[in-house]
Regions:
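Structural signature of tandem-repeat unit edges
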Residues: 1-13, 20-35, 45-58, 68-187, ...
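Structural detector for tandem alpha-solenoid helical repeats, activating at a conserved register
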Residues: 35, 212-215
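Conserved hydrophobic site in ankyrin repeats
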Residues: 217-220
Length: 232
């Protein structure tokens, strides 16, 4: 939706100032919102987090054009309704931390969605441009069935992350799945725990920025029972 400009000095205005450009860092959208027009967050360069309900029915084209800083999505899911989450993810190609909540606000899953980017490469003999995709993030953006996230499909993509992404990315993705094991099978749990045990060097790097992250991660990797689900 288009935002009105801020008033000139001395000019009166009603309501809140425009939320646009470098002023928006975190935006929370109401449950009653059903439509966002084209280029709704155009050039919100400092936007980092977006909280929204999955029931938004219409998202305009170019919704996040110029929003390369978005790094966190917090979505409240409405049961038995079409979800807009796949469309939102399709508009953002960067690495994203995704929190999924039920209608009461309780966290049901925390996921890491890796990045991807596309580039046009010239095929000189054929005189055509070939679109090449880099990174495994595009695969994660298709882990949906009838707009609902499919955890088994998400977990099945972990081998791609291990090959194409940095160890820190793979470790954080694994930690999220162990911390919130919604739909996590025993075989998938094993693959995540095995990766963390085989890459102890990531503990040191992660510990520099989040000591609690390190402590809880170590507990999960060392335990032999079920994954722990915290209250966040």
């Amino acid at each position: 939706a288009m935002m009105r400009k801020e008033p000139r000095p001395g000019q009166k205005q009603e309501g809140m100032p425009a939320i646009c450009g470098d002023k928006a860092e975190s935006v929370s959208l109401p449950k009653t919102l059903v439509r966002i027009g084209k280029y709704g967050f155009y050039n919100c360069e400092k936007l980092r987090k977006l909280t929204f309900w999955s029931s938004i029915r219409d998202l305009g084209a170019g919704l996040f054009t110029g929003c390369r800083g978005v790094e966190e999505l917090d979505v409240w899911m409405e049961e038995e309704k079409k979800s807009c989450l796949p469309e939102v993810l399709a508009e953002l190609s960067q690495t994203l931390r995704l929190t999924i909540r039920d209608q009461t606000g309780a966290v049901t899953a925390k996921l890491l969605i890796p990045e991807f980017f596309e580039e046009s490469v010239e095929n000189t003999p054929a005189r055509i441009l070939v679109l090449e995709t880099h990174g495994c993030g595009h695969r994660y953006r298709y882990c949906f069935r009838q707009t609902q996230m499919q955890m088994p499909e998400y977990d099945a993509l972990f081998p791609y992350v291990c090959v194409e992404e940095q160890p820190e990315t793979a470790a954080q993705l694994a930690w999220y799945r162990l911390w919130y094991p919604s739909g996590l099978s025993e075989s998938s749990k094993k693959q995540y725990k095995t990766y963390l045990k085989e890459h102890p060097e990531v503990y040191t790097k992660l510990n520099k920025t989040a000591e609690s992250f390190f402590v809880e991660l170590q507990k999960i990797v060392d335990e032999s029972g079920r994954g722990y689900q915290g209250n966040h």
